[in-house]
């Protein structure tokens, strides 16, 4: 199967819309990065936004994108809460990390924050300043439901690392099926991302990082899924 170019698949309107609306990505608060990352896996993103907003209201955070809210603050305020209490009263979301023997995502968030804090990571700046992320990533992967490392990469993205992407079903479908790369390992997918970024960047210099391309692909695939559901409904 011949590989295709992202430029031949995604209409130019998606690229132009992204460029016109480039803005700061993610959150200043590491806690919010973790909440977004854990709750967004295998979930409709609108439910993740509601969960974030419920927490922001409960924690009295004024601006969820600009305000600092540290791991220490979370543990001071919610460290004694059980996973059940967090799920029911704070996040108002009882999703689990897996439908088979998964723990509450609320519990996973708490364990994530505890792991970061005991390793001296309190803010996004602390996380992005790590010289070697392997030890902390390994510890995070020991949390039930976090073994793949996907949420860790997404936390890094949300914290400000622009050379990350979030691997999910839509990204896999785009690269493996639509572009024709076939089944890819994590390293191979990263290489494919960089290959497509070079192609896109030649035409759109403003799009110069993996995170930006990930956002464009995600937007395209989300709308494609909606259109397909509408077509299926009319059959």
Regions found by a protein language model. Name each.
Residues 1-101:
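Structure-specific DNA junction-binding interface
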Residues 64-68, 74-80, 116-122, 162-167:
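Short, exposed beta-strand "edge-strand" segments with a Pro/Gly-rich flavor and a Y/T-containing core
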């Amino acid at each position: 199967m011949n590989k295709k170019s992202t430029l031949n698949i995604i209409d130019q309107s998606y690229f132009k819309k992204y460029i016109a609306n480039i803005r700061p990505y993610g959150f200043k608060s590491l806690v919010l990065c973790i909440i977004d990352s854990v709750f967004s896996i295998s979930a409709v993103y609108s439910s993740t936004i509601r969960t974030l907003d419920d927490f922001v209201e409960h924690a009295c955070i004024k601006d969820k994108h600009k305000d600092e809210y540290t791991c220490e603050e979370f543990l001071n305020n919610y460290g004694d809460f059980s996973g059940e209490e967090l799920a029911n009263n704070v996040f108002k979301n009882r999703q689990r990390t897996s439908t088979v023997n998964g723990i509450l995502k609320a519990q996973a968030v708490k364990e994530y924050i505890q792991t970061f804090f005991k390793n001296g990571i309190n803010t996004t700046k602390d996380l992005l300043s790590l010289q070697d992320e392997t030890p902390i990533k390994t510890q995070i992967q020991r949390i039930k439901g976090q073994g793949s490392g996907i949420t860790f990469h997404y936390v890094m993205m949300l914290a400000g690392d622009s050379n990350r992407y979030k691997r999910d079903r839509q990204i896999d479908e785009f690269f493996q099926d639509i572009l024709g790369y076939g089944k890819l390992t994590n390293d191979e997918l990263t290489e494919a991302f960089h290959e497509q970024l070079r192609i896109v960047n030649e035409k759109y210099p403003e799009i110069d990082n993996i995170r930006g391309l990930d956002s464009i692909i995600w937007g395209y695939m989300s709308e494609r899924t909606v259109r397909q559901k509408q077509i299926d409904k009319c059959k």
